[in-house]
Amino acid sequence: MLNKPSGISSNRALQISKRLLSAAKAGHTGTLDPMAQGLLPICLGEATKFSSTLLGVDKTYIASLRLGYISNTGDAEGEIRQVVGSDVNPPDFGQVTGILQTFLGRSSQIPPMFSALKQHGKPLYRYAREGITVERKAREIVIHAASLDTLSGFEMTITVRCSSGTYVRTLAEDIGKALGYGGAYLTALSRISVGHFELSQACDLDQLESETPVNRQKLLCPIDSLLNDIPSIVLDDDEALRLRQGQKIRKNMSRYGLPVNTQLKLYDDRNVFLGLGERIDPEVIVPRRMISLHEVVTGAIAGSVDLQ
């Protein structure tokens, strides 16, 4: 897991990590804006086969907002203008807490123009830089939790746990409007969790750079840590070999108590992770995504690092 610093794109962080870890393949599981910092899961080598498992998971952010001002980008990197009079009083703690509760649950959110979403093959931010606004479809999001951490005048910090695809920049502006200040923009943003991964598990680029090649490998998470919610089974040598060769196997599954069409993490009898299979019949398992064991370095080229 990578703790991406502010001021660098996720893709730049990805490329640095890929170089330092001498990985042939690499990909991240969800972009962080350049201004944002925090958890960026990066998958390396064979782990890229399983990166999609993190794309739809919930995420948690700590966001700092400035009320009464808006930005064309939704954050401190854009053109900022005041939208409320200087004679307006700041909110109190109870007022903000009450408004935050109204955002809980399901709602629709229109993605911002300054985003990487594509329209006709072109990222929205490119239209925005050309002064063009295009129609965007609203997307359903879920705010699971939102709490006020600090409040000082028109500046506040909140913690938000939300569904994948939620734009915290848009949420910040909507909170500012709901409080009666015409909007708000982000002055800072940190992602502190992605699914079951926490920022406390992450390393930063300076640490990665300072370590020896051997110690860098020790910072990586094992590939199967991406698949914590998927049940596992143990195979004997013959079963493992046949699945790795792309063949289906018959196996007595009665002791596992799992329904048909269940995805399965596959391990050999030495507890080596082999990949994902699926139970397509009460006693039939087929391979779905198997790893090439000779390409896995210390089993950890599943390392997760969050960057754009």
Swiss-Prot record:
GO terms for biological process: mRNA pseudouridine synthesis; tRNA pseudouridine synthesis. Its EC number is 5.4.99.25. This is tRNA pseudouridine synthase B. One of its GO terms (molecular function) is tRNA pseudouridine(55) synthase activity. It holds the Pfam family TruB_N. It comes from Nitrosomonas europaea (strain ATCC 19718 / CIP 103999 / KCTC 2705 / NBRC 14298). The gene is truB. Belongs to the pseudouridine synthase TruB family. Type 1 subfamily. The keyword Isomerase applies. It catalyses: uridine(55) in tRNA = pseudouridine(55) in tRNA. Keywords: Isomerase, tRNA processing. The active site is at 33 (nucleophile). The keyword Kinase does not apply. Responsible for synthesis of pseudouridine from uracil-55 in the psi GC loop of transfer RNAs.
